[in-house]
C-alpha cells in the first residue's frame, strides 16, 4: 500500500475532519457521567471513546458507499475517494467490516444488554444514508444514530435505560436535527437537483427559524433533565450559555446565509463540550458541598 492509498483511506474514514467525532463523543461522555452520578470508571471512558471514533468512521464509509453515484454530482463531495476512483467499493466494504469488528470487540467488554443494543446502533448507522432517498427529514435518523451511545452508556453502567436517559437522548436528537440542517444547507441546491431529501430542503425559506426552534427544544429538554435530576443552578447557567450561543448563531445565519453554514455546523461541538463540563462540575459540587 503506497502513501497515496493510505491518504485515500484516511480521507474515506474522515479522520481529517474530527468535528463530527466530537459531536458524537461529548453527549456519550456526558451520558457516562449522568449514569455514574459522577466521574465514570476510566475503562468506560476508553471503551466508549474508541467505540465512538470507530463507529463514526464506519458510518462515513457506509454513507460513501450508499451515495457514490449521488456524490459525483455535488461539488463538495465529487473528489471523495470512492467517487474519484482512488479506492474501490470492495476496498471500502472490507475496511468497514474490519472497523465494525473492532467496535464489536470493544463492546464485548460490556454487559449483555449493551452488546444487544450495539446491533441497534449498527442498524441505525446503515439505515441513515438510505433514508435520504425516501424520508423527508433524514436528520432525525441521524440524530437517533449519532446519539445512541447515550443509551449504551446508561445500559453499560446501570443495566437499564432510565427516564433521564430518554430525556437527554431526545434533547440531543433535537440538537442534531438543528446542526445537521445547517450542514445540509451547503448542498441544498444540489439536493434539489438530484432528488435527495433533507430538512434543509423541507423547511425551505423558514429553515433558520426551524433551526432555532430545534435548538430551543433541546434546551427545554435539558431544563427538564435538570429538574428531574435535581441539579443545582450551575447546570442552568450552562443552559443559558448554550442559549446565547444559539441566538448568536441565528443572527449569523440570517446575515451570512449558507456561506457560513459549514463553520456554523462545526462550532456546535462547543455546545456538547459545555454540557459535558457542566455535568461533571454538577456532580463535583454535589460530592463536596
Swiss-Prot record:
It catalyses: all-trans-octaprenyl diphosphate + 4-hydroxybenzoate = 4-hydroxy-3-(all-trans-octaprenyl)benzoate + diphosphate. It is a multi-pass membrane protein. One of its GO terms (molecular function) is 4-hydroxybenzoate polyprenyltransferase activity. Its EC number is 2.5.1.39. It is found in: Cell inner membrane. Keywords: Cell inner membrane, Cell membrane, Magnesium, Membrane, Transferase, Transmembrane, Transmembrane helix, Ubiquinone biosynthesis. It comes from the Bacteria. GO terms for cellular component: plasma membrane. Pathway: Cofactor biosynthesis; ubiquinone biosynthesis. Its cofactor is Mg(2+). GO terms for biological process: ubiquinone biosynthetic process. The keyword Nucleotide-binding does not apply. The chain crosses the membrane at residues 19-39, 42-62, 85-105, 107-127, 134-154, 165-185, 211-231, 233-253, 265-285. Pfam families: UbiA (PF01040). Catalyzes the prenylation of para-hydroxybenzoate (PHB) with an all-trans polyprenyl group. Mediates the second step in the final reaction sequence of ubiquinone-8 (UQ-8) biosynthesis, which is the condensation of the polyisoprenoid side chain with PHB, generating the first membrane-bound Q intermediate 3-octaprenyl-4-hydroxybenzoate. HAMAP family: UbiA. Belongs to the UbiA prenyltransferase family. PANTHER family: 4-HYDROXYBENZOATE POLYPRENYLTRANSFERASE, MITOCHONDRIAL (PTHR11048:SF28), PRENYLTRANSFERASES (PTHR11048). This is 4-hydroxybenzoate octaprenyltransferase. It comes from Francisella tularensis subsp. tularensis (strain WY96-3418).
